[in-house]
Amino acid sequence: MSVVNNRVALKHLVSMEHLTNEEVMGLISRGSEYKAGKVAIKDNSRHFAANLFFENSTRTHKSFEVAENKLGLRVLDFNADTSAVNKGETLYDTVLTMSALGTEICVIRHPEDDYYQQLIDSPTITASIVNGGDGSGQHPSQCLLDLLTIYEEFGHFDGLKIAIAGDLTHSRVAKSNMQILKRLGAELYFYGPEQWYSSEFDSYGRYMAIDHIIDQLDVLMLLRVQHERHDGSQSFSKEDYHRQFGLTEERYRRLKDSAIIMHPAPVNRDVEIADHLVEAPKARIVAQMANGVFVRMAIIEAILNGRNENV
């Protein structure tokens, strides 16, 4: 991995922990340039990408697809439900096949934590791996689009007071963001149900009731309640969760005028956030979705740069 004259080159992108601060800022800057229409698109028609999603996805899957098409790559169709996976084919063998066919970039979402390790360690698989989300592990492209959204608003990260709120233990978005935001100098706070908090987060920030800090926040990053990863003992009624931990109208009014609200989506309306606040003036949820395309264009370009360096 390298950065030369703001040109980022990556072999893979699987975890925010593997990126330097310089690479992070380079990807954010490049995403911003794509958004502003300042980048001349090269002829990438000889490059193939495959989006291998083994969990449901709308924003990540489709924004990668849009990004790949905007860059002129050829995108291979893949549907896990109609693939050889249903005949017992492993993830490794699926990616091995894609690589053998000449696919250069595999964007993968999979329910297994760290699924990517066996792929990037393989001496046979030559495709570059972009992690579109692994279980409760990492979600680097979501983190980068979140960073772009924050940077557009404030122009820096150092000293910003940012609360990450909700289903922390099960959230790959939370883990990716807390790791890099701490490194970039942000002051982090966490809140949500105690059973969805882990002491491993203590090294990144402070666990605090939202009502004690909300009027000081620059960024309120809400997380989806991940019902699919819970057992019955962890359930709340929608009303109870919203009242205790959600962004209600009363809490919204206490935010600073300059504060912004974020959410990786999909949003459980009237659970994590009151329905009418999803598109409120302080909300940047739609902006995050739009920024996803441009950041993912920057990621794909960086992967192609890295592959060209190794030719």
Curated annotation (Swiss-Prot):
Keywords: Pyrimidine biosynthesis, Transferase
One biological process term in Gene Ontology: amino acid metabolic process
Catalysed reaction equations from the record: carbamoyl phosphate + L-aspartate = N-carbamoyl-L-aspartate + phosphate + H(+)
Gene Ontology CC annotation, any one: cytosol
Pathway: Pyrimidine metabolism; UMP biosynthesis via de novo pathway; (S)-dihydroorotate from bicarbonate: step 2/3
First-level EC class: transferase
UniProt-listed PANTHER family: ASPARTATE CARBAMOYLTRANSFERASE, ORNITHINE CARBAMOYLTRANSFERASE, MITOCHONDRIAL
Recorded family membership: Belongs to the aspartate/ornithine carbamoyltransferase superfamily. ATCase family.
Protein name: Aspartate carbamoyltransferase catalytic subunit
Source species: Streptococcus equi subsp. zooepidemicus (strain MGCS10565)
